[in-house]
């Protein structure tokens, strides 16, 4: 899985978000290491929708937009399973690095 797909799914794991909120959450969680530019973000969301990992949903009740109608996205059960599998795969890599004493336990 592409790293930005994993980060997008992680951002959606707890609650529905619009594009800018996804971008901000990923940027903050990665300490600025990953910047999702609009083309990258919306291209990924379009493909992830086709794959069945996310769906577009309505804005939460009471959401105040500064204009326009932001698109909100929700992770699907399939998206959650795929994200969890990727997390397990990455955790195995971290465990291997720890066993080689490249990381502290």
Question: Whereabouts are the PLM-identified features?
Answer:
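Basic amphipathic alpha-helical segments that dock to polyanions
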Residues: 41-48
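Beta-hairpin "wing" of winged helix-turn-helix
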Residues: 49-66, 74
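Amphipathic alpha-helical dimerization/coiled-coil segments
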Residues: 78-105
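Basic, amphipathic "hinge/linker" alpha-helix immediately C-terminal to the N-terminal HTH DNA-binding motif
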Residues: 64-84
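Residue-level recognition of specific faces of alpha-helices
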Residues: 8, 32, 44, 71-72, ...
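N-terminal helix-turn-helix DNA-binding core of bacterial DNA-binding proteins
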Residues: 1-40
């Amino acid at each position: 899985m592409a790293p930005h797909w994993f980060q997008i799914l992680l951002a959606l794991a707890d609650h529905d978000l619009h594009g800018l909120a996804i971008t901000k959450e990923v940027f903050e969680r990665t300490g600025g290491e990953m910047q999702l530019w609009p083309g990258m973000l919306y291209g990924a969301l379009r493909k992830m929708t086709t794959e069945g990992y996310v769906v577009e949903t309505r804005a939460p009740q009471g959401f105040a937009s500064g204009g326009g109608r932001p698109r909100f996205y929700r992770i699907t059960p399939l998206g959650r399973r795929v994200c969890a599998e990727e997390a397990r795969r990455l955790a195995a890599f971290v465990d291997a690095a720890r066993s080689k004493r490249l990381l502290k336990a």
